[in-house]
Amino acid sequence: MKPTFRPHRKKRARKIGYRARMATASGRKVIKSRRLKGRKRLTVV
């Protein structure tokens, strides 16, 4: 069997990076809630 998780930084950033989050209303809500919670890192990568 092949491994199910094959990490790629570029793919991850494009899907769940800061700019990807800011592109949609729900993504902006995610960033906002993480800011309000006091997260040190708003997005992964």
Curated annotation (Swiss-Prot):
One BP term from GO: translation
Domain of life the protein comes from: Bacteria
GO cellular component: ribonucleoprotein complex; ribosome
Gene3D superfamilies: 1.10.287.3980
GO MF, one example: structural constituent of ribosome
InterPro entries listed in its UniProt record: Ribosomal_bL34
Pfam families: Ribosomal_L34
Family statement drawn from the similarity comment of this UniProt entry: Belongs to the bacterial ribosomal protein bL34 family.
The protein's name in its UniProt record: Large ribosomal subunit protein bL34
Primary gene name: rpmH
